[in-house]
């Protein structure tokens, strides 16, 4: 009969599982920290680039933390992409009313030609600034 002592291997597997859980926990902490850093930088960018009129877009930048993932996004703000990427010229037509009118207009109109708007990126630059820090912090956690 051949006997093999696996106690060292069993101990190694247990240590490896513990290490794996610790690494997962540390990675989650790094992701969470970077997510909130990106959110803060995006809010600062939106303020600094002159895009804040009501504060609605800035308040809409949020961070969601999940299991081994973090998402920084603009929740339910339809014009956020237009601010980030800019817009082409387009025609705005009255939807519910028969005409468009705004303070200072000479008379109501059925449509107006919007010249478009230049991009005022806020989210992508925030990520780009944080990316190197995130990679460095993840490398520290994963090396053992």
Mark where each language-model region is:
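Short, Lys/Arg-rich flexible segments
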Residues: 1-80, 93-144
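Short, His- and charge-rich active-site/binding loops that engage polyanionic ligands
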Residues: 90
């Amino acid at each position: 009969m051949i006997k093999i002592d696996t106690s060292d291997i069993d101990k190694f597997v247990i240590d490896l599982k513990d290490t794996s859980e610790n690494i997962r926990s540390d990675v989650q902490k790094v992701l969470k920290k970077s997510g909130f850093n990106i959110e803060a930088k995006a809010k600062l960018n939106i303020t600094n680039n002159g895009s804040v009129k009501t504060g609605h877009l800035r308040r809409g930048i949020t961070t969601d933390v999940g299991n081994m993932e973090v998402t920084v996004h603009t929740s339910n703000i339809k014009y956020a992409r237009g601010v980030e990427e800019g817009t082409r010229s387009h025609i705005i037509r009255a939807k519910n009313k028969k005409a468009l009118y705004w303070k200072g207009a000479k008379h109501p109109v059925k449509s107006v030609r919007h010249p478009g708007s230049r991009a005022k990126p806020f989210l992508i630059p925030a990520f780009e600034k944080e990316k190197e820090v995130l990679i460095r912090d993840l490398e520290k956690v994963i090396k053992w």
